[in-house]
Amino acid sequence: MKNQTTKNIILVFVGLALLSGFVYLKWDNFTDVGTNLINLKNSHPTQMVSYDTFLHYLENGAIKKVDLYENAELAVFDAFESLDQNLLKPVPLLSSDTLFGILNSDEFRPIGVKIPVRNSSLILTLRDYKIDFTAYPIVNFDSIWPILSVLLIPVLLIVVYRLFFSEGSNYDFFGNLRKARAKIQLDADTGVLFSDVAGIDEAKQEFEEFVSFLKMPQLFTAVGANPPKGVIIVGPPGTGKTLLAKAIAGEAGVPFISISGSEFVEMFVGIGASRVRDLFETAERNSPCILFIDEIDAIGRQRGTGVGGTNDEREQTLNQILTEMDGFKPTSGIIVIAATNRADVLDSALLRPGRFDRQITVYLPNIYGRIEILKVHSRNKNIDSKTSLKFIAQRTAGFSGADLANILNEAAILTARANLETITIKQIYTAIERIIAGLEGVLLNDSRNKRLVAYHEVGHALTGTLLKNHDDVQKVTLIPRGRAQGLTWFTPDEQPLMTRGQLSSRLIGTLGGRAAEKVIFGKMEITSGASNDFFKVNSLARQMVTRFGMSSLTPMAMELPKPTIFFGRSVQTRPDCFLDIADKIDLQIIEMVEDGFEKACITLERNRLLLDQLATLLTQIETIDGKEFEQFVSTYTGLPKKPQLKIVKAKENKNKVKAPV
C-alpha cells in the first residue's frame, strides 16, 4: 500500500512537470489566446447604428474613442450624452452578458457601425477630430488547438497508466483480453452417453478404459500402470469426434471442459500461451475431468515450417501446451482429448508417448453404422413405419453421421411444409437429393434440349449397366438440381480396395454421356454438359497412372505423397519426376481417356435401339428408378454378371528348381 501511494505521488509530480513544461513551451500561444479573448469580448457591440448616424455623432463631439475590428470593416465606439438632447439620444444604461460568462457593467453599451468598403478617409476624419482609435487584428482561434493537442498528450498518458498498468487498478486490460476472448466451456454434465453415439463401435471400445480410469483410477495405479494423458481423435468432418468426447465425460460423470484451437491465437504476443495456462489451471481445479481441444491443428502444426523458420505466436502456444502436458502428475485425473481432421500437419512432439499417447481414427460409417446412426437420429421423429432405414442407408454411401442427421432434419422440414403428419420415404429421398445436388430447378420445356439431356443421362446409365465392373444404377432423372440439367445416380461400392477393372469401368461410364451425344447427334451437336465429366475423368486417369501404377508406362507410382501444405516447405520441394517422364505421363493419360471414350461409343452403337427407347421413355416420365432401368435393359440384352475374385494359376516351369535344403 505504501509503495502504491509513493508511486501515485511520483505520478502526480511527473504529470505536473509535464504540464508545466508544455505550458512554458507554448506560452506565446497562451498570450495570443488571451488577447484574442479580450478582442472577442469588445468586438460584440450591443447596438448597431448606420454610418450616417456615426458621422453625425462624430461631428457633434459625442464620441470619445473608436476601436476598429475586422480590417476596419467594423467600428465600435463609446458615446456619451450630448448637451443637445434633440440631436442625440442617450445610450441606455444596461447590464450585459459577455461572450464567456456573467459580466455586470455600469458603463454604456458599446455602439457598432459597419464601415463602407474601401473607406480610406475614416482614419483621416478621426485624426481631424482628435479621436483616439485603435485597430485590432481579426480574432483568430487557431492558436488554441495546438495548446489543446499538446495538453492532451500528458493527460492521455496519465489516464492510460491509471487504467491499464497501475497495480490495484479495477480494470486489467491485458488480463481481460486474455480471458474474455477465450471461450472456455465448462459442463458439469454433458448429458451424452455412449448409447447416443452410433456407427463408430471400434472407437467406443477404445474409450471404455478411459471411463474406467476416471471412475476407478486405483485399479490402474495399484498395478503400476500410468493412465493415458491424452488421445487425438482423427476423422473426417461430421463423424462424431466431439460427440464421442462428450460421451466419455458423460459415462464417467466428470466435468467436460472444451475450447477451440483457434481461441488461443491472437495478434498479441504471449496471449495464446497465457490462455493455455488458464485452461490447464481450470482443468486442475475441476479434476478429474475431460479437457477437450477441438481443431487442435490450428495451434499444433509442425514448428519451423514458415518462411525462414521463424518463431511465431502459434509456436509459443504449442510449446506451452507441451510443457503443461509434461507437468501432469500420474494421479491428476485429467485426460486431454483433441480432435482434428488434419493429423498429418501436427507436430511430432505433440504425438509422442507421454503427451498424446494414442491416436484413434474415426472413419465414415459403413452401411451397418449408418443404420445405427439413423436409429439414433430418428428417435424423436415421426417416421412412417413402412420406411426402411436399411434402404436409406444403402442410398447414402459415404455419408457421415452429421450428413445423416441433416437428411432426417431436412425430411422433417419438407414434411411440415407439406402439412403431413409422418415422414415418408419420398421426403427422405428428396432430402438426400437436395443435400447432394442442390435445390430442385424448373423442368426443361424445350423438346430439343430435353432430348439432348435425356440421351446424355441415359448414355451414362446404359454404359454403366452394360459394364460388369461398374456400380449399379440407382436413379436417372431429368429434374434439374443445382447447375445440372439432369442427373444419373449410382450406388458406389464401399469396398476400400478398387481394382483396375473397376476404375476403368468408372472412367468409361463417366464418358458415356458425351459418347451418347456423339453417337446420336454427331460431333457438331455435342454439348458443354460433359465439362464436369471430363474433370472427373482426368483426375481418375491421373491417379491410375501416377499413384496406383495401373498403366503400361510403369507399375510404380510416379507421384510422391504430398507434404504438408506449408509455404516454407513448398518452395523447397523438388518435382516428383523429370520433365520427360511428365510428358509421358500426360500422353498415357490422354491414351487412357481416348481408349475409354472409344469403348463407350462402341458399347452405345451396339445398343442403339435400346438407347433410343430409354431416352424416349425418360423424356416422357422424366425419372426412371434403378431397378426399373435394369429390368428394361434385361428385356433386350443380357446383364453382365458381377465379377468374382479369381486366382491366376502359376505357369508351369519346365526347368524345375530344387528347393534349398
UniProtKB/Swiss-Prot annotation:
Membrane-protein topology: Multi-pass membrane protein
Coiled-coil intervals: none
Stromal topological intervals: 1-7, 162-661
Active site per the UniProt annotation: 457
Cofactor descriptive note: Binds 1 zinc ion per subunit.
A Gene Ontology term for the protein's cellular component: chloroplast thylakoid membrane
Pfam hit, one: AAA
Keyword Nucleotide-binding attached: yes
Enzyme Commission number: 3.4.24.-
Topology feature Lumenal, residues: 29-140
Binding, ATP: 235-242
Regions that span the bilayer: 8-28, 141-161
Source organism, top-level taxon: Eukaryota
GO molecular function, one term: zinc ion binding
Subcellular localization(s) per the UniProt record: Plastid, Chloroplast thylakoid membrane
InterPro entries the record matches: AAA+_ATPase (IPR003593), AAA_lid_3 (IPR041569), ATPase_AAA_core (IPR003959), ATPase_AAA_CS (IPR003960), FtsH (IPR005936), P-loop_NTPase (IPR027417), Pept_M41_FtsH_extracell (IPR011546), Peptidase_M41 (IPR000642)
Keyword annotations from UniProtKB, A to Z: ATP-binding, Chloroplast, Hydrolase, Membrane, Metal-binding, Metalloprotease, Nucleotide-binding, Plastid, Protease, Thylakoid, Transmembrane, Transmembrane helix, Zinc
Needed cofactors: Zn(2+)
Function in brief: Acts as a processive, ATP-dependent zinc metallopeptidase.
Subunit structure: Homohexamer.
Family: In the central section; belongs to the AAA ATPase family. In the C-terminal section; belongs to the peptidase M41 family.
Designated name of the protein: ATP-dependent zinc metalloprotease FtsH
Native source species: Ectocarpus siliculosus
